[in-house]
Amino acid sequence: MNAKEILVHSLRLLENGDARGWCDLFHPEGVLEFPYAPPGWKTRFEGRETIWAHMRLFPEHLTVRFTDVQFYETADPDLAIGEFHGDGVATVSGGKLAQDYISVLRTRDGQILLYRDFWNPLRHLEALGGVEAAAKIVQGA
């Protein structure tokens, strides 16, 4: 799979609650970054198992559907820049999430080396019921 296909596949895995499958798309030394994470939250996770420790609770706390996936063309098949929308529901709070994302993926040999995810953390905080509830997902607490 090229980087665009991997990004689309990764979104489907998250929609299906398969956080382990999502993490398995990463190279063992892959990196997940959230440049706009709120102060005090980690912005970088290095290594597939560290990413899994961060993402493992995602399906328990949030269901999401992604739509309007668009890509910005690049000359490199191992680089994808995607823009998409996500609508979700926080399982515990019942809060609704409407979020727009921009994700940059760098891949090699069908694995994610870098997934840089840009999103508005305030929308997640609102949907999840505040800072403490959001920390359970975002920080893997």
Curated annotation (Swiss-Prot):
SUPFAM superfamilies given in the database record: NTF2-like
UniProt xrefs under InterPro entries: NTF2-like_dom_sf (IPR032710), SnoaL-like (IPR037401)
Lineage: superkingdom: Bacteria
Family designation: Belongs to the PhzA/PhzB family.
Name the record gives this protein: Uncharacterized PhzA/B-like protein PA3332
